[in-house]
Each structure stands twice: as structure tokens, then as C-alpha cells.
């Protein structure tokens, strides 16, 4: 909307209508000690001057760096059609579709998104999304606690540390017992997790690929978890589901993910969306909205919000969660992106990303002193141990136009020399070669 300041004449007219002499008189009831003395702000500027100032500030951003950052958020290519379709006003300005008779387009889009997510994860049901991957994991944890009526949660240390911090924060006052099982050189410690499960365990939480990029098959572990009547929760990377064994195939009860990698640009932490899917037995424990397909009395297909007794606008205190909105626009972008790619396109995206990562691992470990930290199979992300501090390497390479990866030591004490490197289909062999040569000359 245009930036239109009030003229002195307009201010005078409004004050006259209100019946006060000045702006100061308007706020006279506020005690002097509570009024701001000065904000030290310059006088207001015109729209043109504001835009010029913002352009000058934006010019300080560096956008031509080659990035190998991952750690849960990935720079995949987004077709132009995603922006074009998702920015249509019918979607962009739509509100929560409480009135199905006037919201069929929005409801069908949500239904199609749910269908796509359930197929992608090989699970029975999906909701209309939550805020992000971390909140999806938290909600999955609460689902397990409600279903099992137990309070012990076993968490792999190889789970994204941002998610673990969020889980700790969200559950601080819920009297849950969070048991963290150490990783094994970047791999999820399946034996230790299985051994930790007992009659008091509500759920086991693992990630595949995990934070270090390591890939596991949890089928046997999940079977052991189920023997104790506990639930298996898996956090995933959506793009990789086309080349890996899915959560459903492994026997997961709840599968969650951050949907950023499909349709959402990297943008200072958001907005993204949390993907939530579950088995049929848990659908009534699912938080957030669920769109369903039905028929009206004339036999015409219609879409509605269903199983609403779970939601706060129906039962408030007894609701499965108090989420007041979802990320419907982000979910739409994910749906559009998936539809544009198709199964073959998504698979090709994943294969290219994995191939580039394995080529990068080969080039980097050919450098003296650089060794693989991630042991065993990995996807499009891996960790290497450097002979020097990873933070220092990142600073030096960034000055040369390359962000070499994520410093694992930020979240894992004792791993200050470990660098987490990610590749996507956008990463070229030329970029990898330049990265390797600059790194060789730096360390």
C-alpha cells in the first residue's frame, strides 16, 4: 500500500472532530513519566526517499556467494510457476476456510497437499501443516504422550540440534522425561536407542537422514519399539524420500519434516512449514486442520474441514493443540512445486543432490588432513573433520566467495573441527572443484 502521511490540515481536521486542541492534548491522560521522551528518530521521509534508503541498505547484502550450507535448510531450485500461482489473490488473501460453501478452492488445495504428503511419506494421514519442522516434532511428541499415557521420550543426539533445543523449550513445564542417546560418529546409535526403550517409554525420536547426513534403515528398531507399546517418530528430509526407504515402509507411527526444501526459498529462517503425517490409529490425536472430501445431497464432490472436535475453536481446553493458524500458503507452494516436478522430477532432484554430495566428499577428502566424519551411507549432506578449526575456515573461505558449510561445533562440544557440507541439484562440479582448491590452499 502507498506510504501517505497526514498533512497538517488533515491532522487539524481530525483534532477538531475529536474536540481537542493538539496531539499533545490527545495523549494528555498518559502520565508524563510513561511517555517517551524521544525516540531519536529523524523526521518522516517521502515514499521515494524511504525506498532509496532501503535500496542502499539492501545493497550491503552479498548474494553472489557459493553456498554449501545445509543443516536442515536447503537451496533447491524453485520453478517460476510456484511464485506465479501461489501469489494469485484467491490463494494469497484467503482466510481459514471455516465456511466450506465459499472456500472450495482453498479446501481442495489443502486436501491435495495432504494427499501428496501422505503419499510422499507413505503414511495414512497428513494434516494441513503446522509452523515448521521443529513445531511438528513437538506436536508429534505430544501425540505420543496422549496416546500412550507415558512421559518418557527417547531422543537421538543425531537429531537436528535446533529441533532438540525447541523440544526442550516447549516441554519444560510438561513434566516429560527426555532421554538423549549419544550419536556414534555421526550415525544414529540404533543399539543404544533400542536398549533404552522400556515400559515407561512413550516414543522414540530419530531423524533420517540425520543431522550429519547419515542414512539408516530403522525397520528393525521400530519393530522393537512397538514391542514395548511405544511409538516411533521420524523426522525426515522430504526431497530424499524419493530415493530412501520411507517412514511408512520402516513402520513409523508419525513422520514429520520441515517443508522448506520443496517450494520455499531460504529467507532468514522463514516462513516455512511443518509437515505432519501419521498412521490411521493416531489421526484423532493429530493437531491442526484436516481437510476431507465428501459428496453433497446432489452427489457433487465437496471439500470440508473434518474431525474438527480436535480443534481449539470447538473444544478449547480439550483440543489436541492450540495452533491458531497453519502455513496454508507455504503448503500450497509445496504442493505446486511437487506437481510441477512429478515423481520423476523429484527423484531426479534427489539423485543429482546425492551425486554432487558424493563427488564433493571425494574431492574434499583428497586434501591432506581432511577426513570423513560421517561414517557409512549418506545422502546429499556429509560431515568432514578438518585439521583446523571449522569456524576459522568458514571465515576465510567466505572472504573468497564460498560458504563452505555449517560448523558442527556450534551445537556439539568437542567437534569444533567438523564441517557439515551440503549439496543440491543447483551445486555444480565446477563450484565443488573451486571449493576444494581454495580449501586446500587455506588449511
Curated annotation (Swiss-Prot):
Keywords: Oxidoreductase. One of its GO terms (biological process) is nucleoside metabolic process. InterPro entries: GcvPA, GDC-P_N, GDC_P, PyrdxlP-dep_Trfase, PyrdxlP-dep_Trfase_major, PyrdxlP-dep_Trfase_small. Coiled coil: none annotated. GO terms for molecular function: glycine dehydrogenase (decarboxylating) activity. It catalyses: N(6)-[(R)-lipoyl]-L-lysyl-[glycine-cleavage complex H protein] + glycine + H(+) = N(6)-[(R)-S(8)-aminomethyldihydrolipoyl]-L-lysyl-[glycine-cleavage complex H protein] + CO2. Its EC number is 1.4.4.2. Belongs to the GcvP family. N-terminal subunit subfamily. NCBIfam families: PRK00451.1. The glycine cleavage system catalyzes the degradation of glycine. The P protein binds the alpha-amino group of glycine through its pyridoxal phosphate cofactor; CO(2) is released and the remaining methylamine moiety is then transferred to the lipoamide cofactor of the H protein. HAMAP family: GcvPA. This is Probable glycine dehydrogenase (decarboxylating) subunit 1. It comes from Maridesulfovibrio salexigens (strain ATCC 14822 / DSM 2638 / NCIMB 8403 / VKM B-1763) (Desulfovibrio salexigens).
Amino acid at each position: 500500500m502507498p506510504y501517505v502521511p497526514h498533512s497538517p490540515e488533515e491532522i487539524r481536521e481530525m483534532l477538531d472532530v475529536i474536540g481537542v486542541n493538539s496531539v499533545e492534548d490527545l495523549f494528555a491522560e498518559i502520565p508524563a513519566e510513561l511517555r517517551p521522551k524521544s525516540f531519536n528518530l529523524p523526521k518522516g521521509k517521502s515514499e521515494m526517499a524511504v525506498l532509496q534508503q532501503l535500496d542502499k541498505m539492501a545493497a550491503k547484502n552479498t548474494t553472489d556467494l557459493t553456498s554449501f550450507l545445509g543443516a536442515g535448510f536447503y537451496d533447491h531450485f524453485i520453478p517460476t510457476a510456484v511464485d506465479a500461482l501461489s501469489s494469485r489473490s484467491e490463494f494469497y488473501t484467503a482466510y481459514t476456510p471455516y465456511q466450506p460453501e465459499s472456500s472450495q478452492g482453498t479446501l481442495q488445495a489443502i486436501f491435495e497437499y495432504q494427499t501428496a504428503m501422505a503419499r510422499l511419506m507413505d503414511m495414512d494421514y497428513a494434516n494441513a501443516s503446522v509452523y515448521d519442522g521443529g513445531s511438528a516434532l513437538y506436536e508429534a511428541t505430544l501425540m505420543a504422550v496422549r496416546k500412550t499415557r507415558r512421559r518418557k521420550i527417547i531422543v537421538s543426539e543425531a537429531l537436528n540440534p535446533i529441533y532438540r533445543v525447541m523440544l526442550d523449550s516447549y516441554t519444560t513445564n510438561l513434566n516429560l522425561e527426555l532421554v538423549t542417546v549419544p550419536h556414534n560418529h555421526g550415525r544414529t546409535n540404533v543399539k543404544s536407542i533400542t536398549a533404552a526403550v522400556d515400559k515407561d517409554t512413550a516414543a522414540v525420536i530419530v531423524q533420517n537422514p540425520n543431522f550429519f547426513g547419515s542414512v539408516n534403515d530403522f525397520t528393525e528398531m521400530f519393530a522393537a519399539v512397538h514391542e514395548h507399546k511405544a511409538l516411533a517418530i521420524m523426522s525426515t528430509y522430504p526431497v530424499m524420500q524419493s530415493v530412501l526407504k520411507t517412514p511408512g515402509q520402516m513402520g513409523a507411527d508419525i513422520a514429520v519434516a520441515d517443508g522448506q526444501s520443496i517450494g520455499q526459498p531460504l529467507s532468514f529462517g522463514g516462513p516455512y512449514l511443518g509437515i505432519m503425517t501419521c498412521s490411521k490409529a493416531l489421526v484423532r490425536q493429530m493437531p491442526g486442520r484436516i481437510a476431507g472430501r465428501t459428496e453433497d445431497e446432489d452427489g457433487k464432490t465437496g471439500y470440508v474441514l473434518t474431525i474438527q472436535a480436535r480443534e481449539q475453536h470447538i473444544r478449547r481446553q480439550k483440543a489436541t493443540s492450540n495452533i491458531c493458524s497453519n502455513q496454508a500458503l507455504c503448503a500450497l507452494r509445496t504442493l505446486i512445486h511437487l506437481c510441477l516436478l512429478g515423481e520423476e522430477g523429484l527423484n531426479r532432484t534427489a539423485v543429482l543432490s546425492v551425486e554432487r554430495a558424493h563427488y564433493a566428499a571425494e574431492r574434499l577428502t583428497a586434501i591432506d588432513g581432511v577426513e570423513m566424519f560421517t561414517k557409512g551411507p549418506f545422502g546429499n549432506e556429509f560431515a568432514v573433520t578438518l585439521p583446523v578449526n571449522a569456524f576459522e575456515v568458514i571465515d576465510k573461505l567466505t572472504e573468497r566467495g564460498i560458504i563452505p558449510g555449517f560448523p558442527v561445533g556450534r551445537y556439539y562440544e568437542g567437534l569444533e573441527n567438523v564441517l557439515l557440507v551440503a549439496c543440491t541439484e543447483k551445486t555444480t562440479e565446477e563450484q565443488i572443484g573451486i571449493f576444494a582448491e581454495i580449501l586446500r590452499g587455506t588449511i
